[in-house]
From Swiss-Prot:
This is General transcription factor 3C polypeptide 5. It comes from Dictyostelium discoideum (Social amoeba). InterPro entries: TF_IIIC_su-5_HTH, TF_IIIC_Tfc1/Sfc1, Tfc1/Sfc1_N, TFIIIC_tauA_Sfc1. Involved in RNA polymerase III-mediated transcription. Integral, tightly associated component of the DNA-binding TFIIIC2 subcomplex that directly binds tRNA and virus-associated RNA promoters. Belongs to the TFIIIC subunit 5 family. Residues 412-439, 448-489, 697-713, 757-766, 773-786 have a biased composition (Basic and acidic residues).
Length: 865
C-alpha cells in the first residue's frame, strides 16, 4: 500500500511540473500562457513624463533645462518645480511647471525575438526568388510600393512576431507636468516698417537702402531719429512689456459635475424637469369663515415600513372616533400614554385632521370632514383662554405672565415684609439657642457629679449587683428624654450637637445605642416631599410638639398633585402633626405605615383640576373637572347660530362663566381675546386698577386715617392740588397698612365703575386745558399786570411794560399765579364746563378722592393676601 501511494504522489508532482512549464490559462474561452515568476530588480530609476511626443531625446532634455535641473528637482527634499519651455529661444515663451510625485512603477524593456526575425527574413527571400523565376504575366500591374509604405510595414509588428519583456528597474518617483500651461503671448511684427530682432538677424534679403537706427531717448521728448535715403519717418517700436505670469491658477479644479438625482428627463421638451417640492407638506389649516378641508394629505413613504408609525396612526384614529376635536397638548398626552411617539404624530396627524387657526376652536385639531359650526353639541369642545397672575399661581415658573405689569407696584412691599419676618424668625432661633446652651451646661455639670458618685458605688458592688448596668441605662434614657422635651424648638443641628455631647460623656456601648434610638424618635427630621417634583420643598417636622417648620428659602407649603403618587399625601399642617411620631418616608425603598412602596413618574395632566399654570393658557370646556364650573357650562343655553368669538354661547353667558372661573381660580388676563365691543369708550380708558385681582371675601367699612390733610392753596389749579392730596394719602395708607379692611363686591360695582370712568374723562380734559393755560400764563404774563382770560378767544396774558432802565439788566421773572385775589380764571373755566368754583367743589372732590383711595387700598390688601 505504501508503494502505491508513493507512485501516485510522484505522478501528480510530474503533472504539476509539466503544467507549470506549458500551462495554459482560460480567460473568456481563450487560452493564454502562464507568466514566468521572476525576482524584482534592486536598481532604481527616476522617471520624467514629458507632455509631448518625443522624437529627439536631447532636445527634450534641453527644453527642461538639462540633466542638472532634473537631478536638483529629484534630490531636493522641498517642493521644487521643473520648468519646461516648448520654445526655449523665444523670450516671450511661458513655461509649464512639473513636480515630483511618489510612484511605484516598473521599468520594462521590450525587444523583438531575433531568432524568429532571422527565420522570417530567410523565408521572405526565398519567396522573392521564386517570383523572379516565374513567367511574367501579359498584363503589367502598376507599381504600388513606395518608401512610405515600406517604412510603415517596418514599424508595424508582424502577426507572428514575438517579443521579449524584461524588468530593468523600479521607479520610486517621477516628475509630472499636471499643471496648466500659461497663456502664450506672441509678438507680431509690422509688415511695413518694423520687424523683430530675430527676423532682422535671419533676414538676408534686406535692402541696403534702408537702415535700422536704434531709438534715442532724451529728457524732454522721445522720438526716433531719421537716417535714410528716402527721408521717411520711422515709427516707434512697441515696448512689449509682458508680465511673468498671466494666470495665477496652476492646477485645474475638479468640479465633479453630476446630474441631480431628483431630476427627470422629459422626452417631449428634451430637458430635465426638477421636482417642485422636496420637503414635507405643511399641515392643513382652516379659518372660521372658510371651507374646511376634506381630502387627507399623503402619508410619508416610510409609513409602509415603520410599524411604530402605523401604531400611532391607529391610536389617533381611535381617539378621533371617541372625540372629534382635540387640543394638541391633550392629544399628545393620550398618544404617549397608549404607547405612541410624538415625532410620528406630527407626520401622521395631517392625514387625519386639520387645525383651526381662529374662532372658538382655536388651535384645535378637528377630524377631517367634521364641521363643528353645524353641530351644536361641539360647544363642550370650545377653548377658553385663561391665565392667572404670578402671585396667585400655586406652581411658579420662570416664564413671565402677561399681567405681571399690573402687580409690579406692590411686589417690593411684599418682599420687604417677607424679609422682615424671616429676620425675626432668625433672631428668635438665636436667642433660643443661647438659652438652651446655658441650660445644657448646667445639666451636664449635675450629670457628671451624679455619674462620678454612681461609678464609685458600682465599682464597690460589682459582684453583688449584676443588673446595675441595665438600671443605669434606663435612668440615662429618662434623663435624655426630658432634655429633648425641653429643646423641642431647636433645629436639627442643635439637637445633633446635644446628643453627641451626651454620647461622649457616657462611655458604655449600651447607652450609645439607646441614645441613637431616642434621637430618631424625639429629634426633628427633614423630609423631602416627592423627589423630582418641580415644587420640591423641605419640611422640618418635630416629633414631640407636632409643629411644622418650613425651610426659610421656601415661604409656602404647596399642595402635592395626587396623580404623581399612588396614595394621597398629607399636605396641611394638621395632617402632618398627626403623623409626627412616624416620619413620612416617601422615597423609594422606604419602610413604615405611611411609606410609599414605589414612586410613579409624574405625567402631564391636561385637565383643569387646579388653577392653570402660566405655561398653558388654552383649555377645553370638556376638560374642566371643577364641579361647580362644569355644572354651569353644562346648564348654559345654546344659541341657534355659531359665532366666531363665543361659538354656540351668548356673550353674557360666556362672560359669566369666565367670571366664575375668575372667582374660583384667580385673575383673568386683561389682554384676553374675548372682549366686548359695546363698551369701547370704557375699554380704552380703563387703567390697570380695574383689572387687578378682586377677592370674594366680605369686606368691612374702611377706617379713615386720623392724620389731617394739608390745606389746599387757594390760587393753585385743581390738577396739582389733587395730585398732591393723592400722594399724601398714599403715604398715609402705606404707613397704616393694618387699618385697611375688607369690603363687599356688589353687583352695582360695574355701574359705579363706568360713572367713575366718565368722571375721569371729564376731569382729564379739564386738567389738560388748565395745564395748557398755565404754560401760556408762565410765558406771557407780565410782572404786576393782572390776568386776562377769554375762553372764546382774545388775550391770554401780557408782559410788564416798565420804562425803567434799571430793569433791563434784571433776568426774566415769572409773575405769581395768584396773590390771594379772586380766581377769575377758575370761575370762567367752571362756567365753561358747567361745574362749581374751586372753593365750592372741595367737598365733591374730597369724596371722589376718598373713593379712589378706597380702590387703591383694596388693591394693596388683595396683593398682600
Amino acid at each position: 500500500m505504501n508503494d502505491e501511494t508513493n507512485k501516485n504522489n510522484s505522478n501528480i508532482n510530474n503533472n504539476n511540473n509539466n503544467n507549470n512549464s506549458s500551462a495554459l490559462v482560460l480567460v473568456d474561452n481563450v487560452r493564454y500562457d502562464k507568466a514566468i515568476i521572476r525576482p524584482l530588480p534592486t536598481k532604481a530609476y527616476y522617471g520624467l513624463e514629458y507632455p509631448a511626443n518625443v522624437q529627439n531625446a536631447d532636445k527634450a532634455i534641453e527644453s527642461v533645462g538639462g540633466l542638472s535641473k532634473i537631478s536638483n528637482v529629484i534630490k531636493s527634499r522641498e517642493k521644487e518645480y521643473l520648468q519646461l519651455k516648448f520654445r526655449p529661444n523665444n523670450p516671450t515663451c511661458k513655461p509649464t511647471f512639473g513636480t515630483k510625485s511618489p510612484t511605484c512603477h516598473l521599468l520594462l524593456r521590450v525587444r523583438p525575438n531575433k531568432q524568429q526575425t532571422q527565420t522570417q527574413t530567410q523565408t521572405q527571400t526565398q519567396d522573392n526568388n521564386e517570383e523572379m523565376n516565374s513567367p511574367k504575366p501579359t498584363i503589367q500591374s502598376p507599381k504600388t510600393t513606395s518608401r512610405s509604405k515600406q517604412q510603415q510595414q517596418q514599424q508595424q509588428p508582424q502577426e507572428n512576431e514575438k517579443f521579449d519583456a524584461t524588468i530593468i528597474a523600479l521607479v520610486p518617483s517621477t516628475i509630472r507636468f499636471d499643471g496648466l500651461c500659461d497663456f502664450q503671448y506672441l509678438i507680431k511684427s509690422d509688415n511695413n516698417n518694423t520687424k523683430s530682432e530675430s527676423d532682422n538677424v535671419n533676414d538676408s534679403s534686406s535692402s541696403s537702402s534702408s537702415k535700422t537706427v536704434p531709438i534715442t531717448k532724451q529728457k524732454d521728448q522721445y522720438y526716433v531719429q531719421q537716417y535714410s535715403d528716402n527721408n521717411e519717418i520711422m515709427k516707434d517700436e512697441p515696448m512689449n512689456l509682458i508680465p511673468p505670469l498671466f494666470s495665477r491658477i496652476d492646477f485645474p479644479q475638479n468640479y465633479l459635475f453630476k446630474a441631480n438625482p431628483n431630476a427627470q428627463f422629459d422626452k417631449t421638451s428634451k430637458q430635465f424637469v426638477f421636482a417642485k417640492q422636496t420637503t414635507r407638506k405643511a399641515t392643513g389649516h382652516a379659518k372660521f369663515n372658510n371651507v374646511i378641508p376634506v381630502a387627507p394629505q399623503e402619508l410619508p413613504k416610510v409609513f409602509g415600513v415603520n410599524e411604530l408609525m402605523k401604531k400611532t396612526r391607529d391610536i389617533l384614529v381611535a381617539l378621533f372616533e371617541k372625540r372629534p376635536i382635540w387640543l394638541y397638548i391633550s392629544l399628545l398626552d393620550k398618544v404617549q400614554k397608549e404607547g405612541g411617539l410624538v415625532a410620528h404624530t406630527k407626520r401622521v396627524l395631517p392625514s387625519l385632521a386639520f387645525n383651526f387657526v381662529d374662532g372658538p376652536w382655536r388651535k384645535c385639531w378637528v377630524k377631517l370632514g367634521f364641521d363643528p359650526r353645524i353641530h351644536p353639541e361641539t360647544s363642550q369642545y370650545q377653548t377658553i383662554d385663561f391665565r392667572i397672575s404670578e402671585q396667585d399661581n400655586h406652581y411658579p415658573s420662570n416664564q413671565p405672565s402677561k399681567n405681571n405689569n399690573n402687580n409690579n407696584n406692590n411686589k417690593d412691599s411684599i418682599k420687604n415684609k417677607e424679609k422682615d419676618n424671616s429676620n425675626k424668625e432668625d433672631k428668635e432661633h438665636k436667642e433660643d439657642k443661647e438659652d438652651k446652651q446655658e441650660e445644657d451646661k448646667e445639666n451636664n455639670e449635675t450629670d457628671n457629679n451624679e455619674k462620678s458618685n454612681k461609678i464609685d458605688e458600682e465599682s464597690r458592688d460589682n459582684t453583688k449587683n449584676t443588673d446595675g448596668g441595665e438600671d443605669k441605662n434606663n435612668k440615662n434614657i429618662v434623663e435624655k428624654k426630658n432634655n429633648n422635651e425641653k429643646g423641642d424648638d431647636n433645629n436639627i443641628d442643635d439637637g445633633d450637637e446635644i446628643m453627641k455631647n451626651k454620647e461622649d460623656e457616657n462611655g458604655e456601648g449600651n447607652n450609645n445605642n439607646n441614645n441613637n434610638n431616642n434621637n430618631k424618635e424625639g429629634v426633628s427630621e427633614v423630609q423631602k416631599l416627592g423627589r423630582g417634583h418641580k415644587d420640591e420643598k423641605l419640611i422640618i417636622q418635630n416629633g414631640v410638639s407636632g409643629e411644622t417648620k418650613i425651610n426659610p428659602s421656601r415661604k409656602k407649603l404647596l399642595d402635592i398633585n395626587t396623580f404623581e403618587f399612588n396614595s394621597q399625601l398629607p399636605t396641611s399642617s394638621s395632617s402632618l402633626s398627626s403623623s409626627s411620631t412616624q416620619p413620612l418616608l416617601l422615597l423609594k425603598g422606604g419602610s413604615g405605615d405611611d411609606a410609599q412602596d414605589f414612586y410613579q413618574a409624574p405625567v402631564y395632566d391636561y385637565t383643569f383640576k387646579t388653577a392653570p399654570s402660566m405655561l398653558s393658557n388654552l383649555y377645553q370646556i370638556i376638560d374642566i373637572e371643577e364641579p361647580s364650573i362644569a355644572e354651569y357650562w353644562a346648564s348654559v343655553k345654546i344659541q341657534s347660530t355659531c359665532q366666531k368669538k363665543f361659538g354656540w354661547f351668548s356673550e353674557s353667558s360666556f362672560r359669566e362663566g369666565l367670571e366664575r372661573m375668575k372667582a374660583r381660580f384667580g385673575v383673568m388676563d386683561n389682554k384676553m381675546r374675548f372682549k366686548s365691543r359695546s363698551n369701547t369708550s370704557t375699554a380704552t380708558t380703563t387703567s390697570t386698577k380695574s383689572t387687578q385681582p378682586k377677592s370674594t371675601q366680605p369686606k368691612e367699612p374702611k377706617l379713615k386715617s386720623t392724620q389731617p390733610k394739608e390745606p389746599r392753596p387757594k390760587g393753585r389749579p385743581r390738577k396739582y392740588a389733587i395730585k398732591k392730596d393723592k400722594n399724601n394719602n398714599n403715604n398715609v395708607d402705606n404707613n397704616n397698612d393694618d387699618s385697611i379692611d375688607k369690603m363687599d363686591l356688589d353687583d352695582e360695582e360695574t355701574t359705579t365703575k363706568s360713572n367713575k370712568q366718565n368722571k375721569e374723562i371729564d376731569e382729564s380734559l379739564k386738567n389738560d386745558t388748565l395745564a395748557q393755560m398755565e404754560k401760556d400764563n408762565e410765558y406771557l404774563h407780565g410782572k404786576n399786570e393782572e390776568i386776562e382770560i377769554e375762553i372764546d378767544g382774545g388775550v391770554v396774558g401780557g408782559f410788564d411794560y416798565d420804562d425803567d432802565d434799571d430793569d433791563e439788566d434784571k433776568p426774566f421773572e415769572l409773575l405769581d399765579d395768584f396773590d390771594g385775589t379772586d380766581n377769575i380764571q377758575m370761575k370762567q373755566i367752571d362756567d365753561f364746563f358747567g361745574t362749581q368754583t374751586n372753593e365750592d367743589s372741595e367737598e365733591d372732590e374730597s369724596d371722589f378722592d376718598e373713593e379712589e383711595e378706597e380702590e387703591e387700598e383694596d388693591f394693596e390688601f388683595e396683593e398682600s393676601e
